[in-house]
Amino acid sequence: MGFNQSISVTKKIDVNKNKLWEFISSPGYLNYCHPFCKKNKIIKWEKDNHSDILEYLNGVVYIRNFIKWDENKGYTLLIGEKNKEQSKVIWEIIENGSSNYLKITVFPYFLKNYPKVISYIPYKLFVTPKLRIYLKSVLNGIKFYLINEVPIQRNKYGRHSWFS
């Protein structure tokens, strides 16, 4: 499964690493922090087998299958509609001195079978800006929830044309 492009966004999260990991590794956590999530339902949440369903506000339903789980550091998952193309997503906790950061990197399935020279312009003009806005909203939602311990309002950081 080769991917031509990736988009990463990193956000400083003002909580200790254990609290951050405990939250992002807990079942159903997107229900509390994801600004475009209508429902986050668990399929399986066991030691070496994690998968869930993410239903967006606009009714799009994605399945997340976790393919790598690195305790207290992060995980890698595949996400997409059932029986369709999937994007690869890496969630990483980064420690830098006394600060903790959460980094999300998405390797979108869009145009992945095209040569980079052909997919470059659509990515730069369309996919990258949309995904960057999406990832910033997700990370802001996680930070908001962990600091305030109050579930986030839907579309808190603005509507998103792909998911609202």
Residue spans for each PLM region:
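Hydrophobic ligand-binding cavity/cleft-lining segments
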Residues: 1-44, 163-164
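Short, surface-exposed coil-to-beta transition loops
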Residues: 6-8, 59-64, 85-90
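Hydrophobic pocket/interface hotspot
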Residues: 19-24, 30, 66, 77, ...
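Short beta-strand segments that buttress and anchor functional surface loops
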Residues: 50-57, 76-82
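Helix-adjacent hinge/juxtasegments
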Residues: 62-69, 75-85
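Beta-strand/loop substructures that line and gate deep hydrophobic ligand-binding cavities in soluble
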Residues: 81-137, 144, 148, 153-155
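Charge-rich (especially acidic), low-complexity segments
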Residues: 152-164
